[in-house]
Amino acid sequence: MDSKANIKICQMSQKDIDSIKENFSSDFDKFWSYETLAQDFKSNDSTYFACKTVDDIVVGFIGLKIVLDNADIMNIAVKKDYRNHGIGSLLLKQAILHAMSKNCMQIMLEVNSTNSPAIALYEKFCFQKISVRKKYYNQIDDAIIMQKIL
């Protein structure tokens, strides 16, 4: 990736969801699937943002669900060859701004305890670890629950 100037963040469309099925198939794993993503996208209380190249190719996305004054980040993904270029930060910042615009008081998320890059990203944005679900993933890895007060 050349520059952040060559990308844009926008609200996701159904066309983008279809594109994700093709372009992110190797990024889906045993913990979440395209079908789960597509179903969540259609939910009235969910909002998804995409990071796209100038050629309109989705290279990252984030989804959040807002219920009353609480936002939950449901998922965030960046294509492998676009990682470590600030796209995750741009997506997370957009999600935080959206939650604030909806008068949310906090944002919650869950992350695999082995996902050090994601944990570092969330801590950079002042998310704090508030709880652990032992052996949550595959009865092996812990899930860390993180929260950001807005």
Regions found by a protein language model. Give the residues of each.
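Conserved acetyl-CoA-binding loop-helix of GNAT-fold acetyltransferases
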Residues: 84-97, 120-124
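Conserved N-terminal entry element of GNAT/NAT acetyltransferase domains
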Residues: 1-15, 131, 144, 148
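Conserved hydrophobic/aromatic "anchor" residues
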Residues: 37, 61, 82, 121, ...
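Conserved hydrophobic beta-strand within the GNAT/NAT acetyltransferase core sheet
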Residues: 73, 107-111
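Conserved catalytic-core motifs of GNAT/GCN5-like acyltransferases
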Residues: 110, 123-144
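Acetyl-CoA-dependent GNAT
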Residues: 11-81, 92-94, 98, 102, ...
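Short glycine/proline-centered loop/turn elements that form peptide/ligand docking sites
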Residues: 88, 92, 115-118, 135-140
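Residue-level recognition of the GNAT/N-acetyltransferase active site
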Residues: 79, 83, 110-112
